[in-house]
């Protein structure tokens, strides 16, 4: 019988592949190591707040524009400046939420853009000469609102300055999430936003202000992402506020609703899903990470471990939240956690979440961007892996169960999960 044992490769051949570095980056964008210092070194704008009258003017022009189907160029800067001027959540408040959190040392806007935003809202001597107080008041209103009377927005013109600014800045901060969200997110969340406005400020929204349509929002989104420095500046502002404000502060809660939650962990879906799996299962993080290791999942799991060790807060120590916005600031950060770079892990985590019935009615986990590209064989493998992890979790973590709870729960879990572990991927996802 012929000897089928394969001879080892010639040393000349094996020497060709020795000493290949293990930290080679093969991504189109060379990866960079994230740090809080590098986050704060990314170029941003440093913009002077608009005056009260200028903020009223910009708010009114925004409301006018939202009635149309086309967002004009330049509104991305006006909306950012209104968002930067967000007022603290208290009835009649004139204090600015972000007054202490505007980044310094950044660049200014081009003069041609500033001319359209920092408009003149005070009458000159020649414009007031020989005019009555009523005439002066009308002339000032024309400077701010324009001399064409829009009957649909008469309610806006009748409001006091602070009310207009409160609503204009709140809407603008809400619109700023278009730097990462689709326009449907704004449309679907509009009524909820109006309710939150009332909750925060104790007053009704200005009902004459229309909900923008999808085409207008698509235009605004294109303008916002055409200048990434706008998004970088907004992230610096809201992350600084999030880092400094007390968790119990109502301003913190408003910033969290308007910006932190929609922007946090953008492009880091694997990490977001891992946290949710840990939350739903209450299993140890180390145990979960080790159970999910394979050659294809390891790079992303390493990335998760680095974040947990270096950047997440502890129960007794609050750390800066900057890492949560890292991929908005630069696509070179945490690339291993992007869905397209770790589809196997993302699919595995989705399968685990379904085991814990963590998705609400109407939610479709398979609609996560990028997950549709996972091949059928990988889906089947990751579905089986999720079944095995789910089924062995009680047996591998017996120390977390009392004798009574072990008798009541673990036996039942073992029986039910042994069946669940045999499901195919198409059965798991109801396909």
UniProtKB/Swiss-Prot annotation:
GO terms for CC?
Answer: helical viral capsid; host cell cytoplasm; ribonucleoprotein complex; viral nucleocapsid
Q: What does this protein do?
A: Encapsidates the genome, protecting it from nucleases. If expressed without protein P it binds non-specifically RNA and therefore can bind it's own mRNA. Interaction with protein P abolishes any non-specific RNA binding, and prevents phosphorylation. The soluble N-P complex encapsidates specifically the genomic RNA, with protein N protecting the genome like a pearl necklace. The encapsidated genomic RNA is termed the nucleocapsid (NC) and serves as template for viral transcription and replication. Protein N binds protein P in the NC through a different interaction, and can be phosphorylated.
Any keyword Phosphoprotein?
yes
The compartments listed are: Virion; Host cytoplasm
The entry's family comment says: Belongs to the cytorhabdovirus nucleocapsid protein family.
Keyword set, alphabetical order: Capsid protein, Helical capsid protein, Host cytoplasm, Phosphoprotein, Ribonucleoprotein, RNA-binding, Viral nucleoprotein, Virion
The segment annotated Disordered runs over 412-431
Where does this chain mainly localize?
virion
Keyword hit for Ribonucleoprotein: yes
One Pfam family, please name it: Rhabdo_ncap_2
Subunit composition and interactions: Homomultimerizes to form the nucleocapsid. Binds to viral genomic RNA.
What are the GO MF terms of this UniProt record?
RNA binding
Organism from which the protein derives: Northern cereal mosaic virus (NCMV)
Name of this protein: Nucleoprotein
């Amino acid at each position: 019988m012929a000897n089928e044992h394969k001879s080892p490769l010639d040393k000349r051949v094996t020497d060709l592949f020795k000493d290949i570095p293990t930290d080679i980056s093969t991504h189109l964008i060379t990866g960079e190591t994230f740090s809080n210092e590098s986050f704060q070194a990314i170029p941003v704008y440093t913009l002077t707040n608009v005056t009260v009258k200028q903020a009223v003017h910009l708010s009114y022009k925004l409301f006018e524009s939202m009635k149309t189907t086309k967002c004009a160029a330049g509104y991305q800067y006006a909306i950012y400046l209104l968002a930067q001027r967000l007022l603290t959540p208290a009835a009649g408040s004139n204090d600015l939420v972000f007054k202490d959190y505007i980044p310094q040392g950044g660049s200014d806007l081009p003069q041609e853009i500033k001319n359209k935003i920092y408009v003149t809202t005070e009458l000159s001597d020649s414009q007031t000469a020989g005019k009555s107080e009523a005439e002066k008041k009308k002339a000032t209103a024309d400077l701010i609102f324009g001399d064409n009377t829009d009957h649909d927005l008469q309610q806006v013109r009748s409001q006091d300055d602070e009310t207009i600014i409160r609503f204009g800045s709140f809407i603008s901060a809400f619109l700023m999430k278009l730097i990462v969200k689709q326009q449907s997110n704004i449309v679907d969340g509009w009524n909820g936003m109006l309710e939150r406005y009332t909750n925060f400020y104790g007053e009704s929204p200005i009902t004459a202000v229309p909900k923008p349509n999808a085409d207008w929002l698509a235009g605004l989104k294109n303008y916002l992402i055409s200048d990434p420095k706008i998004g970088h500046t907004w992230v610096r502002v809201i992350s600084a506020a999030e880092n400094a404000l007390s968790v119990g502060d109502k301003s913190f809660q408003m910033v969290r609703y308007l910006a932190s939650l929609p922007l946090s962990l953008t492009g880091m879906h694997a990490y977001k899903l891992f946290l949710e799996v840990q939350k739903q299962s209450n299993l140890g993080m180390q145990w979960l990470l080790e159970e999910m290791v394979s050659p294809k999942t390891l790079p992303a799991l390493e990335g998760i471990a680095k974040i947990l060790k270096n950047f997440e807060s502890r129960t007794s120590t609050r750390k800066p939240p900057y890492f949560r916005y890292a991929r908005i600031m630069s696509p070179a950060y945490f690339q291993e956690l992007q869905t397209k770079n770790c589809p196997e892990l993302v699919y595995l985590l989705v399968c685990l979440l379904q085991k814990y019935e963590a998705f609400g009615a109407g939610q479709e986990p398979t609609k996560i961007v990028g997950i549709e590209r996972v091949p059928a064989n990988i889906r089947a493998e990751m579905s089986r892996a999720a079944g095995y992890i789910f089924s062995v979790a009680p047996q591998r973590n017996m120390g977390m169960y009392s004798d009574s709870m072990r008798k009541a729960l673990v036996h039942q879990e073992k029986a039910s999960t042994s069946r669940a572990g045999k499901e195919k991927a198409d059965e798991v996802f109801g396909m």
